Amino acid sequence: MLDKVKKPGWRQVKFGDVVRQVKERVEPETSGLERYVAGDHMDTDDLRIRRWGEIGSGYLGPAFHMRFRPGQVLYGSRRTYLRKVAVADFDGICANTTFVIEPKNAEELLPEFLPFLMQTDAFNEFSVKNSKGSVNPYINFSDLARFEFALPPLGEQRRSVSLLSALEDQIEAIRAASNATTKLRKSVALDAFSLVDSPKVKMGAVADIRNGTTPRRARDEYWKGSIPWLPTGKVNDRIIDAADEFITEQALEECPLTLIPAGSTLIAMIGEGQTRGRAAMLAIDACINQNFGAVIPGKTLDPWYLFYLLESNYEALRHWSQGTNQHALSCGLLKEFPIPIPDLNRQREIVESIKEIEANERQLAERFKKTAEMRRVAHQVALSVG
């Protein structure tokens, strides 16, 4: 609850006193609308809707019957710890698990102020605390309506909107620059590898390729040790420099595990969606599970050249398993994967050209982090005093 000492003109209200849930039901096929927004179309801490589905392009579940209009706020009521709040800038349909919200009176609560209120830590903490269920927690609007906060007068709301909107614009500019820099890096890498005219060799001839296993969870003596252990999902880190789970020396000795050295490239051999074929650079010594393939470079391979090469061959690696029964990669298949190997000097030239762009990516990521923290603090200041 945002209940700091209030300035003159501020008043304590409940969310449900000034906000309403819009329940405008439509039939998707006859609504004349073209787009729908599902939960996975909304991103954490991002007020913009950047993706959507096309109505009529495939099966749309029976829950998708709530209409939203430009300016209304969409709020993901499932797993609210994901902080999914977005402002619609087009007409569309969402599921009934996505709340469509608007102010009851725009002369009391500015529509532009509402989404910033819903991004505050206090609002999110209240929503998470009052959610029901454990596997897929959800909150009812009637519970959300009990959230209390100090409502600023309209002039204060306008000033807060001006500040927060400026920060949103900064974040959007940094995000756009970051996306452009990432695209440039990928393009430079593809161009560099396409110009390599060295003969291709089977990867197993120039690298040691192996996988690991998952020690039995029931054996307590195998877990909570000091040796990093990585599941396949860690591939999304791209540069893996920390582990979330650790195993013991006993697990390393008794299970079919090897400590994979830093500088190896890990490839996700099995995975739903876009996971299979992804590559990550291992920046620490670690053990891996059975669905990771570790490519440990030999003397003729620069570790970063190998990583960038395999990262650029994402689609080729995904399709390398075609024709197999399980539609998955394996250590055997990875050993057969052909890669070009120029001399080490040329490899390092390619690496340096990519690393130069990566340095810019890191700078932008740091700017994004700092600006996002400024935005978070500004959210709190906008709704509290003292």
Could you say what each language-model-derived stretch is?
Residues 1-26, 146, 150-158, 169, ...:
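Non-catalytic DNA-recognition/assembly elements of restriction-modification systems
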Residues 2-3, 8, 78, 92-99, ...:
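A short glycine-rich beta-alpha junction/loop motif
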Residues 16-28, 37-70, 204-219, 233-262, ...:
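Sequence-specific dsDNA recognition surfaces
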Residues 42-43, 81, 235-236, 272-273, ...:
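Active-site/binding-pocket entry motifs
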Residues 64-66, 70-121, 231-232, 248-311:
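A short beta-sheet element
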Residues 123-126, 316-317:
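Periplasmic-binding protein-like
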Residues 161-167, 352-357:
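Extracellular/lumenal glycan-associated surfaces
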